[in-house]
Amino acid sequence: MSVQNNQQARPYIYELDLMRPVTAVTVVAVHVLAFTQFLNHTTTGLQVQNGIITSVHFTRDVFMFITALALTYVYFGRPFSGKRFWAKRSIGILVPYCIWSIAYTWVNTSQHSPAAFAELALFNILTGNASYQLYYILLTIQLYLVLPLFLLFLKHIKQHPWRALSISFALQVLLMYLDYRYLQQGSLASSGVWQIVAVSQGSFLLTYQFYFILGGLAALSLQQARAFVLRHGKWIVGGFVLALAAVWVHFLLQVDVYHESLSYATSVLQPIMVFYSPVVIVLLCWLACRWASRTNQQEHPKGYRFWHILSDASFGIYLVHVFILTALLQWVVPFMPEAWPVALRVFLTWFLTAGGAAGISILLMKTPVLSHLVGRSAHWHSPWDANALHEWFSYPFHHPRKVEQKGSGDAQHV
């Protein structure tokens, strides 16, 4: 469905209810895989685990895609009020980001003299350094700051989307090549301003420009995009299998032929990921569209309530899971029987981390006052309906409720 210049409420995107939590628990998987490598005592085991890490390193690119899609879908072609926009975001994302940044700073700091702690907490809030997963929220805030310019840019390129995507893709490949070859491995990162760039590149908006543009353009033609992925499901699955094989072959060449370090071979910012991540994005879109297209009598997809709750909880999962993973790595994982296969211990660590984070997030979002910790606003009188106050999905973890047609009661969705 092409976005039109009108003030009518736009149809609810059910597909995002699936894509958000799937991506969130995959983020948990990335971190679990990265921090449980010590369980492997063989070279082969380490290579297998790092190969899997490489294959799930698409999560940040998917988040960028979803963020741009949601923002564009809500705001493109409409008058933009910065005051209203930031009033919503201050409650939905800035407040929880600041609170969790302070909490992580407190836990990760050995001494807590008030002045030093306040200075460090402020620095971490500004840089996203309080915990390793918070960089994404900083990226989201950067996109918020340039959103009017981004929407204006989309207005200029919407008549030539494929040309714009091709140029953006080529620039992304070139950027990742230069970054991977000269900044991450070469001596450039140790000199002058490039040292700052090397440290902060993962939290810089333009590092992911292709995925933002891809999401923005997808939002302008949602119905056509949905029809396309539903029509080419077999090709999409086949393309993903080939892309996954290519990523693994590339990884093996890096470590076994070129003898590069595992950390370098598993870098998120490398050219191969520019080819792989879009394939995964299309695959996730196809899976989500298949799910959303099969509705029940209430015009909801099957299992909608389950996925809807997880989608609401996904922001909290993202924020809280590092606390749980750190505790498990210290108090549980070392005491798992060594007779258990490494794969089982890694899976259990992921399951406990993701499940615990989901449970805590759901509990928080249903609890008045505490719901603000996960960007929600529950009320004492009606915890379940309180989230109606956050009927915005213009950032990647929040979204509007279904849009009802007056007089028919039928839910519209993309």
Language-model-detected regions and their locations in the chain:
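Membrane-interface helix-boundary motifs at transmembrane edges
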Residues: A9-I13, G77-A87, L152-W162, S221-K234, ...
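Functionally critical transmembrane alpha-helices in membrane proteins and complexes, commonly lining
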Residues: Y14-Y75, I93-S101, L206-T207
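Alpha-helical transmembrane segments of multi-pass membrane proteins
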Residues: V25-F38, I102-S110, L175-R181, W248-L252
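Interfacial loop-to-helix transition and helix-capping segments at the boundaries
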Residues: N50-R60, T127-L139, L183-Y211, W248-I281
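Transmembrane alpha-helical segments and their boundary/interface "anchor" motifs
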Residues: I53-R60, Y75-W106, P114, A118-Y132, ...
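Hydrophobic alpha-helical segments with transmembrane-like composition
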Residues: N108-H112, A116-Q184, V199-I213
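Alpha-helical transmembrane segments of multi-pass integral membrane proteins
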Residues: A245-W248, V255-P368
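Membrane-proximal cytoplasmic C-terminal regulatory module of class A 7TM GPCRs
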Residues: T367-Q405
